[in-house]
Amino acid sequence: MTSLSRPRVEFISTILQTVLNLGLLCLDLILVVFLGKETVHLADVLFAPEQTSKYELVEGLVVYFLYFEFIALIVKYFQSGFHFPLRYFVYIGITAIVRLIIVDHKSPLDVLIYSAAILLLVITLWLCNSKRLKRE
């Protein structure tokens, strides 16, 4: 097995980075389309007369923010020199668990466990934003 020369390794790295960037751009376009569809859905739910539409509206808002956070994560990836900041994944995790609590709140024990998971993620976020771990 021969070792690859430095220019060849850099070329392979550049090709893979380009493929990754194009994939993320495609994903971003798909998320923007879904964000637009969710906006239309939220407008429909907002003007629906049913009582259950309030829960659908809140759930739709949280899903809207999830799309928004994923788009912001991709934007931050390109702005920060092709790396994903950890705290954006934590934000997405918190929002996803909040959505889960809103949608599935039948079991008090499950809600307590989800709340503990949110607390753990908030502590993680606090640790990531401390001076020792701050990169930005």
UniProtKB/Swiss-Prot annotation:
The keyword Transmembrane helix applies. It is found in: Cell inner membrane. One of its GO terms (biological process) is cellular response to phosphate starvation. Pfam families: PsiE. The chain crosses the membrane at residues 15-35, 55-75, 82-102, 108-128. One of its GO terms (cellular component) is plasma membrane. Keywords: Cell inner membrane, Cell membrane, Membrane, Transmembrane, Transmembrane helix. It is a multi-pass membrane protein. The keyword Cell cycle does not apply. NCBIfam families: PRK02833.1-2, PRK02833.1-3, PRK02833.1-5. Belongs to the PsiE family. HAMAP family: PsiE (MF_01048). This is Protein PsiE.
